[in-house]
Amino acid sequence: MREIIHLSTGQCGNQIGAAFWETICGEHGLDNNGTYVGNNELQKSKLDVYFNEATSGKYVPRAVLVDLEPGTIDNVKTSQIGNLFRPDNFIFGQSSAGNVWAKGHYTEGAELVDSVLDVVRREAEGCDSLQGFQITHSLGGGTGSGMGTLLISKIREEFPDTMMATFSVVPSPKVSDTVIEPYNATLSVHQLVENSDETFCIDNEALYNICQNTLKLPQPSYAELNNLVSSVMSGVTTSLRYPGQLNSDLRKLAVNLVPFPRLHFFMVGYAPLTSMGSKSFRSVTVPELTQQMFDAKNMMAASDPRNGRYLTVAAFFRGKVSVKEVDDEMHKIQTRNSSYFVDWIPNNVQTAVCSVPPKDLDMSATFIGNSTSIQELFKRVGDQFSAMFRRKAFLHWYTSEGMDEMEFTEAESNMNDLVSEYQQYQEASIDEEELEYADEIPLEDAAME
């Protein structure tokens, strides 16, 4: 089977990762020890994508948990799902990266990276046909961003033919832990543009807004934010974990969503999102799900899709839904809002339906959009980066770890290039595309036509 190896790096990555494993164990009928207690054959049919069956009959996640300090990993070990994971797959240092990207990427992280790669190799050897890796991390800290991107590039070297998907939490000014987040994020994006195949951008600010405005939680805790992320991750990976035709592995997902290799940063959305109080007062319908999942307020990245255009979209509906109704609704959305979809990629909205609903819900929908408006997110980080870098503020934290200012300049210009590429394709239209092709036809061919 086509296996996926999961890596959690840093505090944020491990917390999201733990929430993800808890969610999918519940969906696949596994208890906290990895024993199958479900009653639906569909739950077992593609279990080996994420789980390894041990001789004892228990299912063990193909997960490697990495951090430069022991705190978060200890919390995962002692949590209710702590017994799921293979004890050798917890790898942690004692020092911490202190929120500095350079420590995670060049010094502290580089010392730990070989022992992580040993575990990754061992996991890969236990696979029949490895399709790729998924990594959860944040871009604002030191370990998830610095060591996370180091791991991505090392795994890229060693497994060049496999896919690399990342769930990356982008820092936002409203929910900020440290002042140097823009540096860490820009240096990370510089790496992700080159080394990741698909990056799902999740943004703390957007998560807070959803919790406060839609779920009516006045003071959302990290656990509640992580639950949101884990429902999205569970939705995004539905087609990988259950039998189906569309986007059934990471590569097919990328083929449908990535028109140009550098533009692989996706926005994700999820429905139904309802506050606890009003849950019992509404029934969820397909039109309502479609409406809500395309709603800008429910995007998990703080950029507004109405300010850009969708290059491609993938939607996953789960539960007892009629395929025809789903297709009709999606078609309606496209025809009513045709100006928000680029016209030079035909059939750029793909829809998949899976009959197994998430736990405790009748139906749900997950949305992945490759929208040019994601540039807002990079612009925001870029502006903060430039403001500090112009004055060389806090640079000594990085140069003292052996980094060069040149790297900062390169990262900045790579991110600016990314923004202008998105802008270029936002403005492109069919006529321009045809003109470009016309330029490429040699004159004698043109004359023959």
Swiss-Prot record:
Q: Which CDD domains match?
A: beta_tubulin (cd02187)
> Can you tell me which residues bind Mg(2+)?
E69
Q: Cross-referenced Pfam families, in alphabetical order? A: Tubulin, Tubulin_C
Give this protein's Gene Ontology molecular function annotations. GTP binding; GTPase activity; metal ion binding; structural constituent of cytoskeleton
Where does the protein end up?
Cytoplasm, Cytoskeleton
Q: Which PROSITE patterns is this protein grouped with? A: TUBULIN, TUBULIN_B_AUTOREG
Database matches in InterPro entries: Beta-tubulin_BS, Beta_tubulin, Tub_FtsZ_C, Tubulin, Tubulin/FtsZ-like_C, Tubulin/FtsZ_2-layer-sand-dom, Tubulin/FtsZ_GTPase_sf, Tubulin_C
Q: Does the keyword Magnesium apply?
A: yes
Question: Which SMART domains does the UniProt record give?
Answer: Tubulin (SM00864), Tubulin_C (SM00865)
* CC cofactor: Mg(2+)
Record key words, sorted: Cytoplasm, Cytoskeleton, GTP-binding, Magnesium, Metal-binding, Microtubule, Nucleotide-binding
GO BP terms: namely: cytoplasmic microtubule organization; mitotic spindle assembly; mitotic spindle elongation; positive regulation of intracellular protein transport
| Principal subcellular localisation of the protein | cytoplasm
A GO CC annotation given for this chain: microtubule
- Keyword presence, Isomerase: no
PANTHER family tied to this protein: TUBULIN (PTHR11588)
Q: Subunit composition?
A: Dimer of alpha and beta chains. A typical microtubule is a hollow water-filled tube with an outer diameter of 25 nm and an inner diameter of 15 nM. Alpha-beta heterodimers associate head-to-tail to form protofilaments running lengthwise along the microtubule wall with the beta-tubulin subunit facing the microtubule plus end conferring a structural polarity. Microtubules usually have 13 protofilaments but different protofilament numbers can be found in some organisms and specialized cells.
The entry's protein name is Tubulin beta chain
Q: Which organism is it from?
A: Candida albicans
Q: Which gene encodes it?
A: TUB2
